[in-house]
């Protein structure tokens, strides 16, 4: 188990894409990681397709120096999460420390609001945020999943297998 005892947080809010949350969580657990689900508060969250998720922690309680990596799943949740300073600050701190951040689908909108999309960085996600990612300085890349520095990017639900492969490889280095 390549990720034994590594603590990884996944950020959620109402409307998170169920599969983009749950499949990477299970895959990382298979590798031995402890995956924390963090919400804006401790109330259960309903996924976009009906999954009910109870957070393990609040985002505000997370500390970048205690986390190995961060996952930003898509759905409608990123549009809510990107508005909160606690979210943006955590993402900025993780990025500044060079820690891996997995970004799939609309999760890229959090990366934009946190200011971690680097000028000229290859990016991908839902085509619904393509213009936003490009306007933030990214170079749109229509590939299922890839690693760019400490960021692991993926487009959509159909790309979850490729996302999980790239994510595990980046985290196992």
Q: Where does each model-flagged region fall?
A:
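Anionic-ligand binding patches
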Residues: 123
